[in-house]
Amino acid sequence: MRVLIINKFLYPNGGSETYIFKLGEALEQHGHEVQYFGMEHEGRCVGNRVNAYTSGMDFHGGSKLSKLTYPIKTIYSKEARVQLRKVLDDFKPDVCHLNNFNYQLTPSIILEIVKWRKETGRDCKIIFTAHDYQLVCPNHMLNNPNTHQNCEKCLGGHFVNCMKGKCIHGSTAKSAIGMMEAEFWKWKGTYKYIDTMICCSEFMKSKMDSNPLFATKTVAMHNFIDKVEWKETEKKDYVLYFGRFSEEKGIGTLIKVCKELPDVQFIFAGTGPLEETVNGIKNIKNVGFQKGEALEKLIREARFSIYPSEWYENCPFSVMESQMYGTPVLGANIGGIPELIQVGKTGKLFESGNAEDLKKKIEKLWGDKKLCEAYSKNCKNISFDTIDEYYEKIMKVYQ
């Protein structure tokens, strides 16, 4: 099978790139041909044999002259269609697997795939993995960045609310462009050509189903995670938070609770805009951003970890990773988080944003070592899809 993986970035940049690289490797290991289409970039590490890519678009840098065309290019890209057609004609894929494409590549690429199918008579499936809520929310988070409140006003296609709420970077102009992009493609009905939409949680699926164009085409598949070796680890007396220090992650609520629990030792591992609020608190040790073996050691030795998110998280790796390393999770009851925790076996849930409930749950776990030990042992039996198991599932979607 020939699979064309499409993503705006073709270099390591975030979770969606990790996803496409590992999926591509798995497909090749099973004998499939894989090529990639996206933006050209000096760090690009995958591609296609005709060397066809779109020009890079830098929303944070670049010349003022080049930015003048961005409002149009972010809605419709003729260049993306022309360059993609070169790849389609040469590679002749059986599957086009779309990932993040809005704004830089634009949904116009879907129209080109449809046109190519009609003109060549080829049977090529269009699969889309949703890494965020972009297709139902122009700012992709279902969260207003100005109020830091979760928001579902755009669900069902009411995208004017994006502009009303200044939901993209707090800017009326940028939010208007986001609204126009969403309204334009709603009017074109382009997303109806997607054969299957892969959602990384049942929660995300429920939100995506609000769009009638693909409500019958969604399937929930949790993200894959590398299998790790189980190790009996002596626990130390600290509670771990590892992740971004930002408002939507619930860090403000967690810090408030930490101050009210001076006898509980917390370790925070990460960076972010709220880092200054983390520093200077006696029972919080900020060890900064950690990765690899250092992060693994922190996770394994923690009595339990906390995932206090206050936005609609989809399938956070941190929640899976903690349990895979034998550390129970106290997670916020929001988004896809509850789907990943075996409540009463490998962790507990608390009401997202509720400091009092979070405090009670921390006190309960901290004061009951035997319960934490039991939860930790139960983590040995928890399983999430590896890339091999995910491959088997995705082949059923492709076929």
Show the residue positions of the predicted features.
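Conserved donor-binding/catalytic core segment of Leloir-type glycosyltransferases
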Residues: I198, K231-K249, I255-K259, I267
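Short glycine-rich donor-binding/catalytic loop of glycosyltransferases
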Residues: E310, T327, G331-P338, S352-G353
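N-terminal strand-loop element at the rim of the active site
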Residues: N7-N13, E25-F91, G272
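A short, well-ordered alpha-helix in the C-terminal region of glycosyltransferases
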Residues: T346, D357, K364, L371-D385, ...
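Short acidic/histidine- and often glycine-rich active-site loop of Leloir-type glycosyltransferases
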Residues: T277, M320, I334-G344, K348-L349
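Nucleotide-activated donor-binding/catalytic signature segment of Leloir-type glycosyltransferases, i.e.
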Residues: E276-K297
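Donor nucleotide-sugar binding/catalytic pocket of nucleotide-sugar-dependent glycosyltransferases
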Residues: K125, L135, E152-E229
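Acidic donor-binding loop of glycosyltransferase active sites
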Residues: R300-N314, T327
